[in-house]
UniProtKB/Swiss-Prot annotation:
Protein name listed in UniProt: DNA damage-binding protein CMR1
GO-annotated cellular components: chromatin; cytoplasm; nuclear periphery; nucleus
Keyword Phosphoprotein: no
Molecular function GO labels: DNA binding
Source organism (scientific name): Yarrowia lipolytica (strain CLIB 122 / E 150)
Key words, A-Z: DNA damage, DNA-binding, Repeat, WD repeat
InterPro entries in alphabetical order: WD40/YVTN_repeat-like_dom_sf (IPR015943), WD40_repeat_CS (IPR019775), WD40_repeat_dom_sf (IPR036322), WD40_rpt (IPR001680), WD_repeat_DNA-damage-binding (IPR050853)
Length: 539
């Protein structure tokens, strides 16, 4: 007999002894049936369902039934085995103690701390707090703007900036002046006419309708069917405020003369074979020059004096560009926010044949790629970027943060690799003098380590709310650089370029999130459109 067989037989005998010590009543023995000689069951389904199964047991024999210890007046939590039933078996006692864990079960009551509820006590307080923060996102559905009153109360003691306090008083006093149904469907983009004599708001919706609302008039807003798909971007012409450019997911950019109502094709991507269709953003930084981004990572550079089918294609990536912005001072610099989880700054003066996208992806070599000036890697996709006159870039995305980058972040910090390299001295930025840009080695990826200001903000819009985008006031008369962004709790948050919150605007009549926001370029007027096509005007 082999050693393995001896161990098996010993286990069988030990198990029999343990069962005998339990003194359990035995059930009526069932007739054993040899599986080899057992008759095959009939496949007649109907008759099999009506006939009762015959297992060979005697119906008259008494059967063991389970009994409730509670109905018998016994403690249901007590151990079913009495001490004398153990038969003095030390092995069985040891097994039962292992099953029960050696601890009597008791109901938990009162307030319990999170540390008391942890099953593993090997982690210290900092470790389990960090673990929970990773699981639940550290309260990702909370925005800093929700605590505006507490922030103001604290900053009044610390902040001595008179401009910030005065701007906060002015913006916090804005009131909901008017509201109107401007478009048929969800508003994707809002623009405020730069003029001050008449307050006009324009909005592009989901089905390609452009809504024009005269705030000072009681007439119904005008609705124009400019495109047959979503309008995600609007911008005014550099030479004339009465010319509006609208971009659409149908792959076109059109111009509209507001005074005459005449509209024409500016860019048509569908007319060219194998072209990238779907325009996500548009800008007119210089006279006769138009930039447009696509849903597949391309940048279109268009001379407005040429035909709509004539343009230059630059490749910036393989994924959707959610939005871009051109530096208002150095118009050759462009910042993009993309679905590839990055914010990138490009120098459009130098281009080369594209071989690989920064990051290693192999791409089509038929297009040119501009020089990559700097890159900031985000945890999730970046929804938008916007540049102001002070050289600051604001971007936000699905990582629930608003990031503000100063000049020192994207021109200087990327050169300091931690080896003691001295950064380049700052150059004062004016309209007449452009910032001298440092040369960057092509062998090193110019990565921005962190922003100058980071603000917690809930950007989880879901399916029915337009993506939130932070937008600067282009030319503030009070000299305070500030931007506005919608709050998912149906508010409008306004922040300064230094990260100070200036206002938290809300009203009982604003019953939906004004996700598509726009500042007037100079005045403290704000327009916000929601998912039902309604527009709110704050003044």
């Amino acid at each position: 007999m082999s050693e393995l067989e001896q161990i098996r037989l010993a286990n069988i005998e030990r198990n029999k002894a343990l069962l005998a010590a339990l003194n359990l009543p035995t059930e009526a023995k069932k007739e054993s049936v040899d599986p080899e000689v057992a008759p095959k069951k009939s496949r007649k389904r109907n008759s099999a369902r009506l006939e009762s199964p015959d297992d060979g047991s005697d119906d008259s024999a008494p059967r063991t039934r389970r009994k409730s210890r509670r109905l018998q007046g016994l403690d249901p939590e007590a151990n079913a085995l009495k001490q004398e039933d153990l038969g003095g078996s030390g092995e069985l006692k040891r097994l039962m103690q292992q099953l029960n864990g050696g601890v009597k079960k008791e109901r938990l009551s009162g307030d319990l701390s999170l540390k008391e509820m942890l099953t593993k006590t090997g982690l210290d307080e900092k470790e389990w707090s960090a673990s929970l923060g990773q699981l639940f996102g550290d309260g990702s559905r909370v925005s800093q703007g929700d605590f505006f009153d507490e922030i103001v109360k604290k900053e009044e003691e610390d902040t001595k900036d008179i401009d910030i306090k005065q701007s906060r008083d002015n913006l916090s006093g804005l009131q909901l002046g008017k509201m109107s149904k401007v478009t048929k469907e969800r508003i994707y983009i809002t623009a405020v006419h730069p003029g001050t004599d008449k307050r006009i708001v324009l909005a592009g919706d989901k089905i390609g309708v452009l809504g024009i609302w005269d705030v000072d008039s009681d007439n119904e807003p005008l609705q124009l069917q400019l495109h047959h798909a979503t309008i995600p971007a609007l911008c005014f012409d550099q030479n004339s405020n009465d010319i509006l450019y609208s971009a659409s997911y149908d792959g076109s950019v059109r111009s509209l003369e507001l005074k005459t109502g005449k509209s024409g094709d500016v860019l048509d991507l569908e007319a060219k074979k194998n072209a990238s269709v779907g325009v996500s953003d548009v800008a007119n930084p210089q006279p006769h020059l138009l930039y447009a981004s696509t849903l597949c990572g391309h940048l279109i550079r268009k001379d407005l004096r040429t035909k709509s089918t004539e343009y230059e294609t630059l490749i910036l990536g393989e994924k959707k560009i959610g939005g871009f912005s051109v530096d208002p001072i150095n118009t050759h610099l462009l910042a993009t926010g993309s679905l590839d989880r990055s914010m990138r700054i490009w120098d459009l003066r130098a281009t080369e044949t594209a071989r690989t996208i920064p990051g290693g992806e192999v791409i089509d070599t038929q297009f040119q790629m501009p020089h990559l000036q700097a890159i900031y890697n985000s945890r999730l996709s970046v929804s938008s970027t916007d540049w102001n006159l002070a050289g600051q870039i604001v971007c936000n995305g699905y990582d629930d943060t608003i990031n503000i980058f100063n000049q020192s972040d994207y021109f200087l910090d990327m050169l300091n690799d931690g080896n003691g390299t001295e950064p380049v001295k700052k150059t004062r930025r004016t309209r007449n003098s452009k910032l001298a840009e440092p040369e960057i080695s092509d062998q090193e990826l110019p990565e921005i380590k962190k922003p100058s200001v980071r603000i917690k903000h809930n950007c989880q819009t879901g399916r029915w709310v337009t993506i939130l985008k932070a937008r600067w006031q282009q030319q503030p008369l009070d000299g305070v650089q500030k931007f506005a962004i919608a709050n998912m709790n149906r508010y409008i948050d306004i922040y300064s370029g230094t990260g100070h919150q200036l206002a938290h605007l809300g009203d009982a009549l604003m019953t939906a999130v004004p996700s598509a926001l726009a500042f007037h370029p100079t005045q403290n007027w704000i327009a916000g459109g929601n998912s039902s096509g309604k527009m709110y005007w704050w003044e």
